[in-house]
Amino acid sequence: MKTIRVVAAVICDSMQAKRKIYATARGYGDYKGQWEFPGGKIEPGETPQQALKREIEEELDTEIAVGNLVGTIEYDYPAFHLSMDCFWCEVISGDLVLKEAEAARWLTKDDIDSVPWLPADQTILDVIRSSMQPVKPLHTSEYDNEPLQRC
């Protein structure tokens, strides 16, 4: 079986806090509409980190910082074996413009399972979830439960 070697960016709001991750819905092929971490194939002569920076620039018009390896997925699809290195990343510059995907969302630890993931990406969600922090509530004041008054 042919092996395809790729990289994926687990883009988070902050590599320290990791409260939200960015996922995209595939816009083409047999798995159209299923969700994945953005990335792509490693070209000859590239390191995984170089490939990831290039792919995110091409797919999302965004510059990223590549952090630590989250893990490597080894997954057998019907037509090929996928070997995918997943890295923590964060945005340095750019607006995450969708050039290939049909949709995108920022997902929290609590709603990471709210989208239909590609089978390979599904296998690393527990590792990602365990590294994420919960989103802090917006209401932190002692006055949060008091009714609003007109000025």
Which stretches of residues belong to each language-model region?
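Conserved N-terminal beta-strand and adjoining loop/helix that marks the start
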Residues: M1-I21
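Charged phosphate-binding loop/patch that engages nucleotide di/tri-phosphates or the phosphate backbone
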Residues: A120-C151
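Short secondary-structure junctions
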Residues: E59-V66
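NUDIX/MutT-family hydrolases
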Residues: W88, V97-I128
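Conserved Nudix-box catalytic region and its N-terminal flanking loop in Nudix hydrolases
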Residues: K18-E58
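Active-site-adjacent beta-strand/loop module that shapes the phosphate/pyrophosphate-binding cleft
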Residues: E63, T72-D95, A103-R105, I128
